[in-house]
From Swiss-Prot:
Protein name: Solute carrier organic anion transporter family member 1B3
Domain Kazal-like residues, every copy: 453-508
Tissue expression as described in the entry: Highly expressed in liver, in particular at the basolateral membrane of hepatocytes near the central vein. Expressed in the placenta. In testis, primarily localized to the basal membrane of Sertoli cells and weakly expressed in Leydig cells and within the tubules.
Outcome after substituting residue 292 to M: In a colorectal cancer sample; somatic mutation
Residue ranges that the UniProt entry lists as topological domain Cytoplasmic: 1-28, 89-94, 198-216, 281-331, 398-401, 561-569, 648-695
GO molecular function: bile acid transmembrane transporter activity; organic anion transmembrane transporter activity; serine-type endopeptidase inhibitor activity; sodium-independent organic anion transmembrane transporter activity
Length: 702
């Protein structure tokens, strides 16, 4: 009999160990799947940011409209965040995250689809690509007393071309795809973190969040690498003979294979969604047992948390909840500390989002860097410095055991240092390019403060040139001309990228003495002084990014500690909504609108409508781009000072040292900063349990 009991106990012990292993493995599988979803999410976000200039050129749109497309991600997120935050924890969280990843991937693929329906990219009005012949039309030169063929185009052909170019309205699909990506990303962070908080071993949540923080950095690494690679590839690669393309990646009309990045990120997101559909709602229960006792489990959970609603009083509870919501909202909005910190955070985030959206365009236009080179350099700069800064910020707060006021001072100090380094960008603004008819007169002697936009001169007045054409050539006098015709060039030799033009009358009038009045395709390169400024800019960017990331880890910690504990979820949710609406959506739009004001030459399509900008006034561009960022950050620093004095008054003499719980929030803050302002929603599920504790509870119940 004793032997029989011993065998039963041994079997029960083995069964218990097997269940324990299965349950722990379920949680580990969730962590692995969530890690892949974080990589996919970060990859998609980086791909959109580095492709925004390519999209602007491909669809022939302004920077402000491109900014609206970029902000559509936040629009999609705002559409469902309330539903996800409230109902998400009550439903099957892994499956919701899986659906989100699936939508995220679908949105990325939808973004790339217009490429397959728009036809071949025409970088010039004279570019007519015939895949069967693998050739392009010849460039126009100065034809005295003759009329160029494009001036004699029949209205029927013009109207036909206009209809074809109306395909540029397919940017709407890019807008919708990015918005769908925003909808899909919404559940990943809040539901993922709450799931970890519910089912991780006691005290291990911070470790898991820190690991997600580190793993999430793989996404930007892959994104910048792919962005740099695809930016080198011509947009219609695989469809046209690349030897017939006469522009290079440094040309302002160059469009890389932007669509490939979205295809890759979309497929990666879809693949990352698959594991979530096979994970249980509760990893602490086997799948069959969970299905049988689902209703009992829900009732038990609600009893444990004192949240069971009386079904007969649902109407009263809804009214009470609505009233309580508005009372809570009033409470945080009448909290001076919260309002001040909300405003300064909004200003700083708006400055960051606006400047980061157009930093690639800035490097291209200001320093003459190709999109591929800009993506590669920014990736090398951003990833290690941001990771180092985030770690350093958390280490300093923990090492010196900073009080809440001390954390606010630390945040202000890092913001001030970053602000001062940002001021150093202004001396690094390069002079505007020497472009005849835009920044200087055709004789090359009279520079003008703003572009003159007078393409015709006596040296090309008899050439019958198309004034709207943008086919830049660089004269051997160092001046860029809008086209070979407007340079007065009479003849040419060579083909495609290697074409050289001769007998250029407008080059001659500048007083060049060598009698070799020639020009070659493309804009004149930047001088050595501007190149040196670029490397200084990169060095300052490294330091600036380091201090920004070091102080950026404090935002969520300060937010949750300046309001009542029961209001911190609402405080973070409301802050996220305001920042997404006024920062994530609006900042790229008004940054882009002001950048558009610095454009010197716009493209025009066959319909005669304005398209994308071909060249900017470098000086004005730099002042607007940097000045707007400074204009947003300076009042934020003033508000920081007010915030610190107000905190001293409120917390003077109180012990506000960082607790273990605050250090947990710091890990979550690092995660939040890495993922560009994603939402953090505190746990709304069951209480945290370890696998061991859950087994003990079950044994006690039996």
């Amino acid at each position: 009999m004793d032997q029989h009991q011993h065998l039963n106990k041994t079997a029960e012990s083995a069964s218990s160990e097997k269940k324990k292993t299965r349950r722990c493995n379920g949680f580990k599988m969730f962590l692995a799947a969530l890690s892949f979803s974080y990589i996919a999410k970060a990859l998609g976000g980086i791909i959109m940011k580095i492709s925004i200039t390519q999209i602007e050129r491909r669809f022939d749109i302004s920077s402000s409209l491109a900014g609206l497309i970029d902000g559509s991600f936040e629009i999609g997120n705002l559409l469902v965040i309330v539903f996800v935050s409230y109902f998400g924890s009550k439903l099957h969280r892994p499956k919701l995250i899986g659906i989100g990843c699936l939508l995220m991937g679908t949105g990325s693929i939808l973004t790339s689809l217009p490429h397959f329906f728009m036809g071949y990219y025409r970088y010039s009005k004279e570019t007519h690509i015939n895949p069967s012949e693998n050739s392009t039309s010849s460039l126009s030169t100065c034809l005295i007393n003759q009329t160029l063929s494009f001036n004699g185009t029949s209205p029927e052909i013009v109207e036909k071309d206009c209809v074809k170019e109306s395909g540029s309205h397919m940017w709407i699909y890019v807008f919708m795809g990015n918005m769908l990506r925003g909808i899909g990303e919404t559940p990943i962070v809040p539901l993922g973190i709450s799931y970890i908080d519910d089912f991780a071993k006691e005290g291990h949540s911070s470790l898991y969040l820190g690991s997600l923080n580190a793993i999430g950095m793989i996404g930007p690494v892959i994104g910048f690498a792919l962005g740099s690679l695809f930016a080198k590839m011509y947009v219609d690669i695989g469809y046209v003979d690349l030897s017939t393309i006469r522009i290079t990646p440094k040309d302002s009309r160059w469009v890389g294979a932007w669509w490939l990045g979205f295809l890759v990120s979309g497929l990666f997101s879809i693949i990352s969604s698959i594991p979530f559909f096979f994970l249980p709602k509760n990893p602490n229960k086997p799948q069959k047992e969970r299905k049988i006792s689902l209703s009992l489990h829900v009732l038990k959970t609600n009893d444990d948390r004192n949240q069971t609603a009386n079904l007969t009083n649902q109407g009263k509870n809804v009214t009470k909840n609505v009233t309580g919501f508005f009372q809570s909202l009033k409470s945080i909005l009448t909290n001076p500390l919260y309002v001040i910190f909300l405003l300064l955070t909004l200003l700083q985030v708006s400055s960051f989002i606006g400047s980061f959206t157009y930093v690639f365009k800035y490097m291209e236009q200001q320093y003459g860097q190709s999109a591929s080179h800009a993506n590669f350099l920014l990736g090398i700069i951003t990833i290690p410095t941001v990771a180092t800064g985030m770690f350093l910020g958390g280490f300093i707060i923990k090492k010196f055991k900073l009080s809440l006021v001390g954390i606010a001072k630390f945040s202000f100090l890092t913001s001030m240092i970053s602000f001062l380094f940002q001021l150093l960008y202004f001396p690094l603004i390069c002079e505007s390019k020497s472009v005849a008819g835009l920044t200087l007169t055709y004789d090359g002697n009279n520079s003008v403060a703003s572009h003159v936009d007078v393409p015709l001169s006596y040296c090309n007045s008899e050439c019958n040139c198309d004034e709207s054409q943008w086919e830049p050539v660089c004269g051997n006098n160092g001046i860029t001309y809008l086209s070979p015709c407007l340079a007065g060039c009479k003849s040419s030799s060579g083909i495609k990228k290697h074409t050289v033009f001769y007998n250029c009358s407008c080059v001659e009038v500048t007083g060049l003495q060598n009698r070799n009045y020639s020009a070659h395709l493309g804009e004149c390169p930047r001088d050595n002084t501007c190149t040196r400024k670029f490397f200084i800019y990169v060095a300052i960017q490294v330091i600036n990014s380091l201090f920004s990331a070091t102080g950026g880890t404090t935002f969520i910690l300060l937010t949750v500690k300046i309001v009542q504990p029961e209001l911190k979820a609402l405080a973070m949710g409301f802050q996220s909504m305001v920042i997404r609406t006024l920062g994530g959506i609006l900042a790229p739009i008004y940054f882009g609108a002001l950048i558009d004001k610095t454009c010197m030459k716009w493209s025009t399509n066959s319909c005669g409508a304005q398209g994308a900008c071909r060249i900017y006034n470098s000086v004005f561009f730099g002042r607007v781009y940097l000045g707007l960022s400074i204009a947003l950050r300076f009042p934020a620093l003033v508000l920081y000072i007010v915030f610190i004095f107000a905190m001293k008054k409120k917390f003077q003499g109180k012990d506000t040292k960082a607790s273990d719980n605050e250090r947990k929030v710091m890990d979550e803050a690092n995660l939040e900063f890495l993922n560009n302002g994603e939402h953090f929603v505190p746990s709304a599920g069951t209480d945290s349990k370890t696998c061991n504790l859950d087994m003990q509870d079950n044994a006690a119940a039996n």
